[in-house]
Regions:
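C-terminal catalytic "cap/lid" subdomain
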Residues: 4-152
Length: 152
């Protein structure tokens, strides 16, 4: 782990020890090109890995990962669980962002790739239904769950 990552990790853990809720935002006005990650989905994955989170939850404008774009294809089916990130899963990410973000499903799948490789589960759920966070915290099915590798 490089010094920068260690400093970030120490800062986040100290803030958590103090009872603070760290807010980390890639689109912050103080973000510079030299330190920019590129999007909040990737940044959240990096932070989840650094703090050794049990679960990363990403909120979107749809209910999870679908077999096709549900905004365009009425036959699209939500995928409840993804045991591994495969080329087929990555292909479902498409190339464009959601109406609310810059990266859309593509960057969420990249985040899933990062955290699941580190052994952390991830959920993509609908941000317009914040009560889903209670279901997710209770272990109930909501959105799409990506399973972290357990062979680490």
């Amino acid at each position: 782990m490089c010094i920068r990552d260690r400093n970030i990790e120490n800062t986040l853990f100290r803030l958590l020890e103090l009872g603070a809720l760290p807010i980390v935002n890639e689109n912050d006005t103080v973000t510079t090109e030299e330190i920019g990650i590129g999007d909040n989905d990737t940044l959240s994955a990096i932070v989840a890995i650094l703090v050794k989170a049990d679960l990363l939850v990403l909120l979107s404008d749809i209910d999870g990962l679908y077999t096709a774009d549900p905004h365009k294809d009425p036959t699209a089916q939500r995928i409840n669980e993804v045991p591994a990130i495969t080329p087929e899963i990555l292909a479902l990410g498409g190339a464009c962002g959601s109406s609310l973000g810059t990266g859309g499903m593509r960057t969420k799948l990249h985040a899933a790739e990062l955290v699941t490789a580190a052994g952390t589960d991830m959920v993509i759920a609908n941000g317009s239904a914040p009560q889903l966070l209670y279901d997710i915290a209770a272990g109930r099915r909501a959105g799409t769950r990506f399973l972290g590798r357990k062979d680490l």
